[in-house]
C-alpha cells in the first residue's frame, strides 16, 4: 500500500524535547535508602516532542522542515546531534536562545522497566522577538510544504500569537494544518484542519465522558465547535475515531500488539497522518495507516520511530493472500480499504461444487468488470438445502481453496443462508455479477447494489456446462 506513496514536504513546529535513557542493571538495594542501585552501562539520546514527530515523518520518507526553540546548552547540542542522523530533516528553523532551557526528560531504566524520570525545564514567557523569529522560520518552511503540523506540548513555544500566525499561513497556502494538542480547551487552534487529542485530552477539553463510540463522537463534535475543524480521537486499545464535518464518522479498531511503552505514540500518529496526507491520500486512509503505525510504536521501548518497511509489513498482515478465505467481517474491512483506494469491487456467488469451464468463464468475465473480485460460496449446509442431501460433492473448505486458487479471484467468503443478501449488504460491492440465465429482477441483492449507485451485470454462460450434469454423469458411469 504505502510502497507506492510519494511523500511530500512537511513543516513541523512546536516544543522540542530531548529524551535521554540511562540504562543499567539492578542487583541490589541501596544501603542508604530503600531504592535500587543501577549500575550504569549506557546513555541513549533521542529527539522528543515536536522533534519526535519530525523523525517519525522522516522515517516514512517525508521531507521535513523542523521549527522550534532550544537553549544554548549541552542538551541542545545533543538534540541537534541526534537530528543529524536524519538527513531529510531540515533544522535551519531551530531557533537558539540563551534565555531558554532545552527541555530534557531523562529516564533511568533497567531492562524495560522505567525506575524514575527526571525532567529539566524552566519555562519562561517568550519575548515578542523570539515569537516573531519562530513565525518567520515557520512561514518560510510553510511556503514550500504540503502539510503543517503544530506539536503542542504546552511548554510555551506555541503561544496564541504564534498559533494564529502559522495556522493563517497554512490556510493561505491551502495545505492541511494538523494540531497535536495539550491545552485545556481548543479555541487557540481555530482554523486548523484536524486536531488529534487522546481520550484523556478529549475528555478534559470537552468536559464530557469518552468511553463508548457514541460518547466519543459527542466529545469530538463538541471539540470541533471550539476550533471549527475535524477531530481524531486516539483511544489506545479502542482504536481511533475520526469525526468530520462533511463525512460519516470513522471508527478504526486497534491492531493487536504487545504494549511495552506508550511514550511518543501520539507523535507517531500525527506524523503518519501528516505523511500520508502529504502523499495526496485521503484523511480516512491516513487514519487507517496511522492506526497500524501506532501499534508498532507501542510495541517498542521508549521514544521510537516506525520505518516505512515496518509499516508496509504491518499493513500487509491485514491483507490476506490473493484468493484467501476470510470471515465476512474481515472481508468488509478489506473491501472498505479497497474502496478508499478507488478500487471497483465485483461480487458474485454460487455453490461452485465441481468447478468446470463454465465456472471459470463466469469468474473471468466477472473479474473484468472491476478491480477486485469477491466470491461468496454457499456453506455445505446451504448447498444441501438447495441441492439435496447428496450435495455438495466437495466440502466447503475444498471448494473455497479451488475457487481461491483461480487468478481472477481476490477474496472468498462463506454464507450459511439460502441467499447472499446479507453478505451483499455487509460488503457493499460496486458490481453484482450473475449468469445470463437470470434476469436482473431475479438477481438477489440487485436492488441493494443499485440503491447506492452500483450496477448488475449478466454474463453469458458456456453451453453444456453444469455441476448437476457432471454429478449425474459420474453416477451413471460404469464402475
From Swiss-Prot:
This protein's name: Bifunctional protein HldE
Gene Ontology cellular component annotations, sorted alphabetically: cytosol
Active site: 267
Pathway in which this enzyme or protein is active: Nucleotide-sugar biosynthesis; ADP-L-glycero-beta-D-manno-heptose biosynthesis; ADP-L-glycero-beta-D-manno-heptose from D-glycero-beta-D-manno-heptose 7-phosphate: step 1/4; Nucleotide-sugar biosynthesis; ADP-L-glycero-beta-D-manno-heptose biosynthesis; ADP-L-glycero-beta-D-manno-heptose from D-glycero-beta-D-manno-heptose 7-phosphate: step 3/4
Family indicated by similarity: In the N-terminal section; belongs to the carbohydrate kinase PfkB family.
Matches recorded under Pfam families: CTP_transf_like, PfkB
Location of region: Ribokinase: 1-322
Organism expressing this protein natively: Gluconobacter oxydans (strain 621H)
Gene responsible for this protein: hldE
Amino acid at each position: 500500500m504505502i510502497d507506492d506513496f510519494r511523500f511530500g514536504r512537511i513543516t513541523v513546529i512546536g516544543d522540542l524535547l530531548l529524551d535521554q535513557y540511562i540504562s543499567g542493571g539492578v542487583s541490589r538495594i541501596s544501603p542508604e535508602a530503600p531504592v535500587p542501585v543501577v549500575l550504569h552501562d549506557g546513555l541513549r539520546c533521542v529527539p522528543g516532542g515536536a522533534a519526535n514527530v519530525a523523525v517519525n515523518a522522516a522515517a516514512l520518507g517525508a521531507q521535513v522542515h523542523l521549527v522550534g526553540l532550544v537553549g544554548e546548552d549541552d542538551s541542545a547540542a545533543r538534540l541537534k546531534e541526534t537530528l543529524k542522523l536524519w538527513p531529510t530533516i531540515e533544522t535551519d528553523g531551530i531557533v537558539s536562545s540563551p534565555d531558554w532551557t532545552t527541555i530534557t526528560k531523562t529516564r533511568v531504566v533497567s531492562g524495560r522497566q522505567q525506575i524514575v524520570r527526571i525532567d529539566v525545564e524552566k519555562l519562561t514567557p517568550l519575548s515578542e522577538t523570539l515569537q516573531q523569529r519562530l513565525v518567520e522560520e515557520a512561514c518560510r518552511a510553510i511556503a514550500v510544504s504540503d502539510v503543517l503540523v503544530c506539536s503542542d506540548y504546552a511548554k510555551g513555544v506555541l503561544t496564541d500569537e504564534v498559533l494564529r500566525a502559522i495556522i493563517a499561513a497554512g490556510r493561505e497556502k491551502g495545505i492541511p494544518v494538523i494540531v497535536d494538542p495539550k491545552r485545556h480547551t481548543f479555541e487557540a487552534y481555530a482554523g486548523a484542519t484536524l486536531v488529534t487529542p487522546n481520550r484523556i485530552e478529549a475528555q478534559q477539553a470537552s468536559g464530557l465522558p469518552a468511553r463508548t463510540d457514541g460518547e466519543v463522537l459527542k466529545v469530538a463534535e463538541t471539540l470541533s465547535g471550539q476550533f471549527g475543524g475535524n477531530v481524531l480521537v486516539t483511544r489506545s486499545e479502542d482504536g481511533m475515531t475520526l469525526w468530520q464535518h462533511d463525512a460519516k464518522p470513522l471508527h478504526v479498531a486497534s491492531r493487536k500488539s504487545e504494549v511495552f511503552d506508550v511514550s511518543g505514540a501520539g507523535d507517531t500518529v500525527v506524523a503518519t497522518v501528516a505523511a500520508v496526507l502529504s502523499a495526496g491520500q485521503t484523511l480516512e486512509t491516513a487514519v487507517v495507516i496511522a492506526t497500524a503505525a501506532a501499534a508498532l510504536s507501542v510495541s517498542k521501548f521508549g521514544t521510537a520511530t516506525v520505518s516505512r518497511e515496518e509499516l508496509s509489513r504491518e499493513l500487509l498482515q491485514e491483507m490476506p493472500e490473493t484468493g484467501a478465505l476470510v470471515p465476512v467481517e474481515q472481508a468488509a474491512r478489506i473491501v472498505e480499504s479497497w474502496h478508499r483506494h478507488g478500487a471497483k469491487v465485483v461480487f458474485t456467488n454460487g455453490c461452485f461444487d465441481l468447478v468446470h469451464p463454465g465456472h471459470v468463464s463466469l469468474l473471468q468475465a466477472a473479474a473484468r468488470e472491476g478491480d477486485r473480485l469477491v466470491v461468496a460460496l454457499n456453506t455445505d449446509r446451504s448447498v444441501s438445502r438447495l441441492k439435496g442431501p447428496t450435495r455438495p460433492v466437495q466440502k466447503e473448505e475444498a471448494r473455497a481453496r479451488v475457487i481461491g486458487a483461480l487468478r481472477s479471484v481476490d477474496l472468498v467468503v462463506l454464507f450459511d443462508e439460502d441467499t447472499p443478501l446479507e453478505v451483499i449488504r455487509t460488503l457493499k460491492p460496486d458490481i453484482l455479477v450473475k449468469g445470463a440465465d437470470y434476469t436482473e429482477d431475479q438477481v438477489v441483492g440487485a436492488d441493494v447494489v443499485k440503491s447506492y449507485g452500483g450496477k448488475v451485470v449478466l454474463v453469458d454462460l458456456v453451453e453444456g456446462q453444469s455441476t448437476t450434469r457432471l454429478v449425474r454423469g459420474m453416477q451413471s458411469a460404469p464402475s
